[in-house]
Amino acid sequence: MTLAEIQKAITENKEVRWMNDGYKVYQDSIGQYLITFIENDYTIGLTHQNGLTLNGNEQDFYIK
């Protein structure tokens, strides 16, 4: 999924995951797109600081 596809899916309230179902991709209450590992709450931004480059490969993001 591209960044635009991920953001659209989240806006449509779809469950987006990265790599496996343990990594949830979502938008927080202040508008940041994040990836959180559910088991330990470790969280990173969806993108690098430039806001364009994904923290992961496009093919590893999917809708659950």
Question: What are the language-model segments listed below?
Answer:
Residues 8-10, 30, 52, 61-62:
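Intrinsically disordered, low-complexity segments enriched in glycine/proline and serine/threonine
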Residues 43-64:
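Intrinsically disordered, low-complexity, charged/polar segments
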